[in-house]
């Protein structure tokens, strides 16, 4: 396993290479030690993986990884290719793209790449939030999403091999405190 933290959960069951997920030398070491590689989230360097894997060593490939690493690509893929309903959104390449938003609605502005768990995001509820939103939109390509009211948040892992598809049990996210997120 590759992880920046020596005491990561996988360390209890696997030999660990301690390095950032974008360390190509560490990815190479991992590829040399393993017959098959997988990844569980989008914080892995797709170019680095492509540079070090052997044919067939990464069954899921990097196409979906690249899509999931860019919110613009992800929204386009989900809404146009997968026909999934997503929150109303628009691409914002600069603060000018935010000039005429309807402030009777709430939004979240998210950087297209690099942001996660609230990083690279700005909630827009009123005109008072626009200055920070303009700064963010001028610093990177972004996606402006309308807020969607929801009752719960789940994660679903789906795995396929081109013939068979497996849907794993859903994970329900609950929050007992402002910063504590639990999966049950």
Model-predicted regions and their roles:
Residues 160-164:
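Short acidic-glycine loop/turn motifs at beta-strand connectors
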Residues 173-178:
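Conserved small/polar residues in nucleotide/adenosyl-binding loops
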Residues 181-184:
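N-terminal low-complexity segments that are often proline-rich with Ser/Thr-Pro
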Residues 78, 89, 103-124, 139-154, ...:
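ATP-grasp fold ATP-binding core
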Residues 11, 59, 83-85, 113-118:
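Short glycine-enriched loop/turn motifs at secondary-structure junctions
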Residues 34-37, 86-88, 119-120:
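Short active-site oxyanion
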Residues 66-84, 89-94, 100-106:
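Glycine-/Pro-rich loop/turn segments that contact NAD(P) or position catalytic residues
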Residues 1-69, 73-76, 96:
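ATP-binding N-terminal substructure of ATP-dependent carboxylate-amine bond-forming enzymes
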